[in-house]
């Protein structure tokens, strides 16, 4: 079976899948709504992620065929991005369906589109980038790394694309994890219990895409999730600062990695600078995130 035949097979399967799915769903909407409203929030959270993945799998199948990806082989970056984008584009649609069922709203989840969110977004973005500038400046001064000056010329061509990706990824992840997930868990748990659980889920789900390099980052990712909860609280329950902060971190780190701007000297353990060149897997990155959280807690 060639690629065109496989693609046709997947498209036909998707049409059949959705026809059967919708025919089964239609008479059960009221029953489902009553069940969700009276269920523990853990069940609601599980239902959200299951529906999200089930809706995405047909798209993932098509993308896998188009990209000629074999499931027994590791994902390449050019294969990962289309899969990630297709998954993330579905999240607001799934949440819109939840809101349509009367189980919440985007405003409840912290997404209020007005002028103030742009100010908060800018504040968070600036804070995220500034924190990393301070961390890397300190590492330059201590001789832990140096700047690859010959690669600076690569920056102008990648700044905007990476910025748009960072804004998209940060926005979707904040809407899901500090928005829907945190708000839903708060219905049954105190805010800090909800924060701990949502941040743990946020950290562990990063293992889906890559395990070896992600595993050392799990504590840092959990702390990052907690700080982003603080950012939402500092913003009066809105997601603006958290979204900007998240996007700023992603944009700065991705720009450094893509352009190859930093080379580590090996003067200190990589557990200080970041295992596998990942700041969240090292003491410096963790202190950066922790310091940002302290600033948010006491000064914003």
For the regions a protein language model found, what residue spans apply to each?
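N-terminal, membrane-interfacial amphipathic/helix-forming hydrophobic leader that caps
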Residues: 2-113, 227, 239, 251-300
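Transmembrane alpha-helix boundary signature
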Residues: 100-107, 135-145
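Histidine-centered divalent metal-coordination motifs
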Residues: 174, 178, 206, 246, ...
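Small-polar-interrupted transmembrane alpha-helices in polytopic inner-membrane proteins
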Residues: 162-170, 190-207, 221-226
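Membrane-interface helix/loop boundary segments of multi-pass membrane proteins
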Residues: 150, 172-197, 211, 230-237
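Membrane-interface helix caps and helix-loop-helix hairpins in membrane proteins
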Residues: 206-214
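Hydrophobic alpha-helical transmembrane segments
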Residues: 46, 121-125, 159-160, 192-197, ...
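Membrane-helix interface segments
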Residues: 77, 105, 116-118, 155-156, ...
């Amino acid at each position: 079976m060639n690629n065109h035949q496989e693609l046709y097979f997947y498209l036909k399967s998707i049409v059949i899948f959705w026809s059967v799915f919708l025919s089964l769903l239609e008479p059960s909407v009221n029953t489902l709504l009553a069940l969700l409203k009276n269920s523990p929030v853990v069940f609601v959270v599980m239902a959200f992620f299951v529906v999200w993945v089930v809706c995405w799998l047909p798209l993932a199948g098509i993308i896998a065929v188009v990209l000629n990806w074999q499931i027994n082989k590791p994902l390449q970056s050019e294969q990962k991005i289309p899969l990630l984008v297709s998954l993330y584009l579905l999240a607001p649609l799934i949440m819109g369906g939840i809101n349509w069922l009367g189980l919440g709203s985007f405003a409840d989840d912290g997404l209020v589109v007005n002028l103030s969110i742009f100010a908060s977004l800018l504040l968070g973005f600036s804070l995220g980038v500034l924190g990393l500038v301070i961390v890397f400046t300190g590492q330059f001064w201590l001789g832990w790394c140096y700047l690859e000056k010959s690669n600076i010329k690569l920056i102008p061509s990648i700044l905007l694309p990476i910025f748009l990706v960072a804004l998209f990824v940060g926005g979707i992840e904040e809407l899901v994890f500090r928005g829907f997930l945190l708000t839903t868990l708060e219905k049954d748990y105190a805010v800090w219990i909800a924060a701990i659980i949502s941040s743990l889920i946020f950290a562990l789900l990063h293992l889906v895409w890559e395990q070896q390099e992600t595993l050392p980052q799990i504590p840092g990712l959990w702390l990052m999730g907690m700080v982003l909860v603080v950012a939402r609280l500092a913003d009066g329950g809105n997601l603006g600062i958290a979204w900007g902060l998240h996007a700023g971190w992603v944009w700065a780190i991705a720009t450094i990695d893509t352009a190859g701007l930093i080379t580590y000297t090996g003067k200190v353990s990589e557990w200080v600078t970041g295992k596998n060149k990942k700041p969240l897997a090292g003491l410096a990155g963790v202190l950066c995130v922790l310091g940002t959280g302290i600033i948010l807690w006491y000064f914003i």
